[in-house]
Amino acid sequence: MHHQTKLDVFIIRAYNLLSNESVISGASLQSVTNSPQTTTNTPSGMVNGAVGTGIANPTGLMGSDSTPNIDEIITSTGSNALTKTNSDSANGTPNGNSSSTSAISNASNPATTGNNASSSATSNGIYTQAQYSQLFAKISKLYNATLSSGSIDDRSTSPKSAIELYQRFQQMIKELELSFDASPYAKYFRRLDGRLWQIKTDSELENDELWRLVSMSIFTVFDPQTGQILTQGRRKGNSLNTSTKGSPSDLQGINNGNNNGNNGNIGNGSNIKNYGNKNMPNNRTKKRGTRVAKNAKNGKNNKNSNKERNGITDTSAFSNTTISNPGTNMLFDPSLSQQLQKRLQTLSQDVNSRSLTGYYTQPTSPGSGGFEFGLSHADLNPNASSNTMGYNTMSNNGSHSWKRRSLGSLDVNTLDDEAVEELLQLTNTSKRQRPMTTAAEGALINDGPDTNLNANNTQMKVDLNPSNSMGPIDTEAVIRPLKEAYDAIISEKGQRIVQLERELELQRQETQWLRKMLIEDMGCVRSMLRDLQR
């Protein structure tokens, strides 16, 4: 059986259940042109040309063609009166919607909370626009819950919003008004008047197999006594996340005027809103930072700091000189010498290698400007005074801490080409670049027991340890949610396109059906005219 037929019967059955077998007015139903919540307030109490007065007495609702009033019509067919009792008002009137009360309902005692989903704002009355909005929001929740629980064994369906269900129900009523006998849903309705309809009871439709199947699927997830959805199945729960029509944002917009006590689970989008666990990258970052800090405390990751401490014997003089003499800091940055010392320790090349011959003797090499390659008798700052000449280079006994390195002791097999490349690109660290070290990174590196380093050395250590950089992890944390969001949007758009294609096909079939009926009616009119002429 086609899923559209099941959906139509489901809408009829759910409407009959949740509206408490109320009367359906084609005039009030068609007055809502677009959707239950986006239209302007039109006279919803208009039935056959009569505008409702908003009072409890329905006897004044007479049609322009002098048809009987609605109360007499329903009473004659064995239904209850259209007057609204106080108990119904206490169960179902939504808060803030007293202005949109039905023209044939009792306006007294409007309660503010309603927990019973099966109770309606009117008892066997005609629904208004605001009430249609609430009713079809409940039908949408019930359908999506039934679909996700697997009660309807049809995998070709998708979650439906209240707007879709309302428009489909509106279309079925229009078909009944155009041709009641030709409509496949005529067996589920009873005509009360020209534009008044009522759905048949369960006892009248107990022999209909599809009606019984839909009723069983509804009662598996819905309790008519309490008016609450019993359970939310998990078999198709994931489809609610990727569908635009069943998304929580749509349902939230539909339920703007709903009552406070509505217990549907789909109206709350907090449990469906997340596309995966987006906190995973942050947790990984925190965990990795904790592990690095722990290793720094235990001395397991102090290789670079030990090498740097060999060339830093007087950190207090280094810090004072850096602050008191900004000119010296501009001429010769201590981070430059530390980076050079670090790279020279890792650089391996034979003494006779031509790759080093000429490089350290050219005017553009680091040996120029009074900075000798041997570093033993180097005048680190010839322009500075004698009290600042030996900062960060003199040990406690007055000798230089740097020693002349023999290039013959370097291993040619462990040559680091990347180190040579970085040596060629060494530049002076400007003051604008130094504050880039964040407080978190400084606290992470300075957490060791023996890290008596200043801010400049902290910046140097961050530069010399690219393995501890959090850049790749931060990039991954930024890219992953974006990718998930784009995938979800693409999936939603794809399903929306498929749904629009289905609706277009249904409208095309309906157009062909109406065209066929029009041709038949024209043929009938022609034959009647011919008979009259004869």
UniProtKB/Swiss-Prot annotation:
Segments of skewed composition (Polar residues): 64-88, 238-252, 312-328
Keywords annotated in UniProt: Activator, Nucleus, Phosphoprotein, Transcription, Transcription regulation
Highest taxon above the source species: Eukaryota
Claim: Transmembrane helix is one of the keywords in the record: no
Biological process (GO), any one: regulation of glycolytic process
Leucine-zipper as annotated region, ranges: 497-534
Biased composition (Low complexity): 30-43, 89-122, 253-279, 295-304
Location of the protein in the cell: Nucleus
Region of interest (Disordered), ranges: 29-122, 230-333
Residues with Phosphoserine modification: S151, S406, S409
Subunit and interaction comment: Homodimer via the leucine-zipper domain. Forms a complex with a GCR1 homodimer.
GO CC list: nuclear envelope; nucleus; transcription regulator complex
Recorded GO MF terms: RNA polymerase II-specific DNA-binding transcription factor binding; transcription coregulator activity
Residue positions of motif Nuclear localization signal: 281-288
Primary location group: nucleus
Record function comment: Transcriptional activator required for the expression of glycolytic genes. Enhances the CT box-dependent transcriptional activation of a RAP1-GCR1 complex. Required for GCR1 phosphorylation.
Designated name of the protein: Glycolytic genes transcriptional activator GCR2
